[in-house]
């Protein structure tokens, strides 16, 4: 059960309505999940949704790599809502379903594509270790460049905020199409 009472547009004050309208008129087109929680604090909602619009739609990464970083973060946080929204998007963007299923099991896929492997390893380490190993950082900088590495950190950080919000406030999933197993040990995701 969600920990905060949900709201309707009629419940919102003027500042909340402004932020609500910014979100609805932006790339998302709707207010769902963590945004519904954040809108209780419209100042946070405004800033977070702006960062989120960049993290989701504006980074230097291809969509498939962004979605890979997102689902890796969501998996480590055991965020079922996040997983169910982004696992299908990762596949649609070009990440093989077998890799997505391996990540769902909290295991490290061995990608055919070196860049996907680098992004996965970087995202997994940053979320699990709260840092990345020197060799992971070096190869990421060499193959991706600093802008894309910074964007991976931004995506992982933003989706950690999302996942924490979803978990802490017990935001329910709107679907149960892709169950996420309960796993507490993520060491098998590390190289």
Which residues fall in each region the model found?
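Hydrophobic alpha-helical segments
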Residues: 1-191
């Amino acid at each position: 059960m969600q920990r905060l009472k949900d709201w309707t547009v009629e419940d919102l004050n003027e500042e909340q309505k402004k932020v609500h309208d910014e979100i609805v008129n932006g790339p998302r087109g709707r207010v769902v999940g963590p945004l519904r929680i954040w809108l209780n604090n419209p100042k946070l909602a405004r800033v977070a949704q702006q960062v989120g619009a960049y993290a989701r739609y504006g980074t230097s990464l291809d969509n498939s790599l962004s979605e890979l970083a997102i689902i890796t973060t969501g998996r480590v946080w055991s965020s079922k809502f996040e997983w169910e929204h982004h696992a299908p998007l990762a596949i649609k963007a070009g990440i093989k379903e077998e890799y997505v299923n391996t990540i769902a099991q909290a295991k490290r896929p061995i990608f055919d594509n070196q860049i996907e492997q680098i992004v996965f390893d970087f995202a997994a380490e940053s979320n699990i270790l709260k840092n990345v190993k020197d060799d992971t950082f070096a190869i990421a900088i060499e193959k991706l460049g600093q802008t894309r590495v910074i964007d991976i950190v931004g995506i992982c950080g933003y989706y950690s905020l999302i996942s924490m919000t979803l978990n802490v406030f017990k935001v329910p999933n709107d679907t149960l199409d892709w169950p996420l197993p309960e796993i507490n040990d993520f060491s098998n995701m590390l190289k």
